[in-house]
Swiss-Prot record:
Organism: Rickettsia rickettsii (strain Sheila Smith)
GO biological process: tRNA threonylcarbamoyladenosine modification
Keyword tRNA processing part of the UniProt annotation: yes
Primary site of residence: cytoplasm
GO molecular function, one term: iron ion binding
Binding-site list for substrate: 134-138, 167, 180, 280
Cofactor annotation comment: Binds 1 Fe(2+) ion per subunit.
SUPFAM superfamilies for this protein: Actin-like ATPase domain (SSF53067)
Pfam family, any one: TsaD
Taxonomic placement: Bacteria, Pseudomonadati, Pseudomonadota, Alphaproteobacteria, Rickettsiales
Catalytic activity field: L-threonylcarbamoyladenylate + adenosine(37) in tRNA = N(6)-L-threonylcarbamoyladenosine(37) in tRNA + AMP + H(+)
Protein name per its UniProtKB record: tRNA N6-adenosine threonylcarbamoyltransferase
Record family assignment: Belongs to the KAE1 / TsaD family.
Enzyme class per UniProt: transferase
Length: 344
């Protein structure tokens, strides 16, 4: 049986997973660093890298035990090798390459974004091509996923990522870190129409997005309010989340038009939303409705596979393993690595 070991360390989650050739997840362990970074209100790169270094060996041992797997049973080792916080990326990549060398097993360098892009093929086994909205704390882009290693970026944020906007607004409201889930929780209790926020470049006619102006508008409102109580916080969270939904819905329509100009596959019309923001149930509902209007089905991974995890890295490794796309051990990890720059 083919077993793929996946390692993810691009930000603040130390993750290790083992999956089989049949897309079965035997074990998927994530060691969160939230408590280590919460006091700073965001991720501190050096702390993250040191934490990966101390957690990876433990995570690997736990995955092997949970999956009843020996190291010698592993067919190949896939590790995030960019983009991300370079310290953590180097730690995970070096750990994987050391295992590869010691075990004489192939190494596969995985683009973290490709891991997110292919998650729906792990969970739903959907065919190529499909339209992807990658929405996380570090990235926000529409991508035509045409095949393995074949990606066309249709548009992206010109400033902040949408997940970053969630986290920064949460910090303005003195909510806990990470901010995305806290905003969603508070938004359920608030009035989404209480405050009217701007929707930058919503009528640009292309797939690019902007969230910096929205974030600034929230900050300005907070500074001008005489009192900030729970009701106000809930209303701001709800209004902010509503505005994000409006922006993304509009841009999904632009992305569908752009996507249909470069693909002729109209019998399987799938839109995938991946990345941490994909876990937001409000946005799932809004974007599902938008997709349905255009005859598309919106697919999103289960919550535990929306945020950073190693199962998605292992699966990307499986697709590359099946195509004999291995990576030399002298591969250099990358802090920046566009999906369009992936080579097969």
């Amino acid at each position: 049986m083919i077993k793929i070991l996946g390692i993810e360390s691009s930000c603040d989650d130390t993750a290790v997973s083992i999956i089989t050739e049949n897309r079965e997840i035997l074990s998927n362990i994530i060691i969160s660093q939230n408590t280590e970074h919460a006091v700073f209100g965001g991720v501190v790169p050096e702390i993250a890298a040191r934490s990966h270094l101390s957690h990876l060996d433990k995570a690997l041992k736990n995955v092997l035990k949970e999956s009843n797997t020996k190291l010698t049973d592993i067919s190949t080792i896939a590790a995030t090798s960019g983009p991300g916080l370079i310290g953590g990326v180097i730690v995970g990549s070096m750990f994987a390459r050391s295992l590869s060398s010691a075990l004489k097993k192939p190494f596969i360098a995985i683009n973290h974004l490709e891991g997110h892009a292919l998650t729906a093929r792990l969970t739903d086994n959907i065919p190529y091509p499909y339209l992807l909205l990658l929405a996380s704390g570090g990235h926000c882009q529409f991508v035509a996923v045409l095949g393995l290693g074949k990606y066309k970026i249709l548009g992206s944020t010109i400033d902040d990522a949408v997940g970053e906007a969630f986290d920064k607004v949460a910090k303005m409201l003195n909510l806990a870190f990470p901010g995305g889930p806290e905003i969603e929780k508070r938004a359920k209790l608030g009035d989404p129409h209480k405050y009217k926020f701007p929707k930058p470049i919503i009528n640009s006619g292309n797939c690019n997005m902007s969230f910096s102006g929205l974030k600034t508008a929230v900050r300005t409102l907070i500074m001008n309010l005489k009192e900030i109580n729970d009701t106000v916080i809930n209303d701001i969270a709800a209004s902010f989340q509503f505005t994000i939904g409006e922006i993304l819905s509009s841009k999904v329509q632009d992305a569908i038009r752009a996507y249909e100009q470069i693909t002729n596959n109209f019998d399987k019309k799938n839109i995938v939303i991946a990345g941490g923001v994909a876990a937001n149930k409000y946005l799932q509902k809004i974007l599902s409705s938008c997709a349905k209007t255009y005859g598309y089905r919106l697919i999103y991974p289960p919550i535990h596979l929306c945020t950073d995890n190693a199962a998605m890295i292992a699966y990307a490794g499986l697709e590359r393993y099946n195509n004999k796309l291995f990576t030399p051990l002298n591969f250099s990890p990358k802090a920046r690595w566009s999906l369009e720059d992936i080579s097969n």
